[in-house]
Amino acid sequence: MEIPYTVEPRRDTGLYNAKVGIWLFLASEVMLFGALFSSYILLRVGADIGEWPQGLLNVPIGTVNTLVLISSSVTVVLGWAALKQGNFAKYRICQTITLLCACAFVGIKSYEYYDKFTHYQVITKDGKVFDGHLVSKNKDQVVLHGFEIDASKGKAAGVTAAHKASHGGHGKEIEIKTAEIQKIGNYGPAHNTYTSIYFTLTGLHALHVIGGALVMGYILFPGAGMWKTEPERYTNRVEVSGLFWHFVDLVWIFLFPVLYLL
């Protein structure tokens, strides 16, 4: 049985079935990310003055990732336009660049995650707080490359200053005896509210990037045979996957300033 409106637009909506479906799906995605964005904003606005961490993320790296995603959206459009003109070779080049951009984005984000999981904060029993990258850790001592946090600046400000300095290659090696440690932890999701929502938002977004790349990769390689038999339907598949990719890009354009700049 043939499914109607797989290629031609529906009479009631002016869209073919897949396009109707993707827009409905994206509407649910807007609600998902909208709820998370709202949670972040409420937590940020409700935090006491000087208590919300700032400057913990690498803005240049975030900027590079933003440019990578924007570039990938451009190549998605160029690839779809190439198919509309019947130029499959150009489409393949553009879509390959898109997939490379997706891999670059995930790779850069993985580097950021690694940096957070190897960056530690240590609180000693006498109340001192140290912040820096982990050099070594054993049963007797922990060695960090970083700084002691200046409590006079306020908790959040002191952490920010130490965090920035250690990322800049400054600081010194600090040896802390295990017996003197009251609390130790990295800047992973469990560190505080900020890192928790940072990993939730960026992790969920990264999963969408990976999912979108897998779909586009399937259409480009194993599913390419449809271009020879049903070129118009194949072009529609590319358009639908492209709409999802533009949504992923749009989410990051909101994420970047909210998390990295504000």
Residue positions per predicted region:
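...captures the hydrophobic TM-helix bundle architecture rather than a specific catalytic motif
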Residues: 1-262
